[in-house]
Structures are given as C-alpha cells and as structure tokens.
Amino acid sequence: MGKLVIGSRGSELALWQANYIKERLKKECFIESEIQIVKTTGDKILDAPLNKIGGKGLFTKELEELLLKGTIDLAVHSLKDVPVVFEKGLDLACITKRADVRDTFLSTKFPDLMSLPKGAKVGTTSLRRSMQLKCKRKDLDTESLRGNVQTRLKKLESGEFDAIILAEAGLCRLNIQGAKYRKAFSVEEMIPSMGQGALGVEMLKSHKHFTALQKLNDEESAFCCHLEREFIKGLNGGCQIPVGVHASLMGEKVKIQAILGLPNGEEVIAKEKQGDKNKAFDSVQELLEAFLQSGAREILEKVQLF
C-alpha cells in the first residue's frame, strides 16, 4: 500500500504540525505518510490584512480542493483557520489535544500591555485581538502584521512595532523564546479564537482511513472545540471576524466565554454561560441567543466597513 499524502502549508509552523501528525500516524495508526506543500490564498497575498482579502477558508481552500480531487489524502490545519461549514464530502477526521490556547504579548522594550506608551504601534493579524486590545487601550495603534512567526518577530526586532501579539501555541511548538519581554494573556484578559491551540485533520468522509484517524482525536479538546465552532456557525461567521470564544470543562460542568465587537473596541458584547456538560450545546444556543438579542448581527454588519 502506498503512503498517504498529507497536505500542508509551507511555513515552519505548518510543517511542524504536519510532521507531528505524520509521526503519530506512524506510531499510533501504523500508517506511513509523506508531506506535500500547498500554497494557499492566505500565503500568496501578504500585503493586505486578512479581512481585506475576503472570503472564507483563506488558509484551507486550496487544500480542500486537493482533498476533493484525491491529490492528497488528508490536510493538517490550525483548527482556528478551518471554516465551520465544510465542502460537500469533507469533514474533520480528528481534533488533537489542545496546546496552550492563550495569546501572547511580545516586545523588545516594554514588559506588558499597560506599560506601552500612548499611541504605541501593536502588530496583529487578527481583528479579534485588535478589538480586545482596544477595549483595554483605546489609544493603541493596531496595525496588520502578516507573514510567518519568524517574519513577524523580525518586524518587532527591527523596531517596526512596539509590540506584537502571537499565539502562545505556535511559539511553544517552534520552541521560540520570542523577545526580551513575553507575557501570555489569561483567557479572561483576551478570549482566544475558536479552536485555538488545536490541530484539525480534514479528510474525505468516504476515505478508507477516515475512521482510523479517530485514534488521534482528543475527546475533551474536540468536545470544547465543537462547542466553539457551533457558536461561530450560529453567528454565520468565518475565521476573520472579531469574535473570541472559549469553552472549557470543569468536571461535569462546561463554561463558555465569548466576546464580539468592532475592531476599534467601540461596540462590544462580552458574555459567558455555564451549564451541565450533557447540555453543553443547549448552553451554546442560549449564549448565542443572548448575543443576537444584544445586537451581534448588527455589529458584524458594521465590521464590513473596517
């Protein structure tokens, strides 16, 4: 039997993730595989903010097209980049155990967010992060920061930015110290993106190895990530909207925290819901309803103007 082909983006972090799945496939599923690098729309267009490029699946669409053609057998994604609605015939075969879900502040000069001078320039790719930064510091100048992790760090070190915000999971996976000052925000300080810290493996549901990859699935992480994805789906949102959502389990209880707002931090809804694990999806719907009643759809319409 030939090797399975893993589709992956070409960045160092994406290849770390693909190799992580490759090793686990061999060790736990006894399946040999090889990696094929694929350039996505998000990789090709680096001179514009992600929300200006338009469309959903900026980092997944080309990989999904190759899955549907049968050119690759599976695609490894950062789960936060995976659209909540799949192309017909595709689905997640597994969601891996979550790494650190937090966002991290990095600076060469300033120890934390509150020590930044007035009007400081902060780099981030994410409207979600911009919105939450502006909630804390309206004066900050949040600017688009594109490129891989190393490119972003070089922009910080060259003085282009006073600080940047990156995902802690990516820094840990690449074993990067980052900068002189590095401080992770708590989930309460900055609510992460849906699925942040987890990897999603996408395949054709009809693929003969689809079920076998369930061995790589982490039940608790998958449960929480599906709750988060359900919330985003209810907003009819994609990966580039200013929404943070995080679900966590505490024994037989679940807590879901969410925030949505304009990128300038002017109109923001923040709520949380706690409930029984066995009624967790009902809790998501109740939280979603509370957001919609508070004007979530109207805010998302205004986001298009930014």
UniProtKB/Swiss-Prot annotation:
InterPro entries: HemC, Porphobilin_deaminase_cofac_BS, Porphobilin_deaminase_N, Porphobilinogen_deaminase_C, Porphobilinogen_deaminase_C_sf
CDD domains for the chain: PBP2_EcHMBS_like (cd13646)
Catalytic activity of the protein: 4 porphobilinogen + H2O = hydroxymethylbilane + 4 NH4(+)
Residues with S-(dipyrrolylmethanemethyl)cysteine modification: 239
Top-level EC class as recorded in UniProt: transferase
Molecular function terms, GO-annotated: hydroxymethylbilane synthase activity
Cofactor binding notes: Binds 1 dipyrromethane group covalently.
PROSITE patterns cross-referenced by the UniProt entry: PORPHOBILINOGEN_DEAM (PS00533)
Cofactor(s) required, per the database record: dipyrromethane
EC number: 2.5.1.61
Annotated metabolic or biological route of this protein: Porphyrin-containing compound metabolism; protoporphyrin-IX biosynthesis; coproporphyrinogen-III from 5-aminolevulinate: step 2/4
GO CC annotation: cytoplasm
Alphabetical UniProt keywords: Porphyrin biosynthesis, Transferase
Role played: Tetrapolymerization of the monopyrrole PBG into the hydroxymethylbilane pre-uroporphyrinogen in several discrete steps.
Other observations noted: The porphobilinogen subunits are added to the dipyrromethane group.
Subunit-structure text: Monomer.
Similarity comment: Belongs to the HMBS family.
Record's protein name: Porphobilinogen deaminase
The organism of origin for this protein: Helicobacter acinonychis (strain Sheeba)
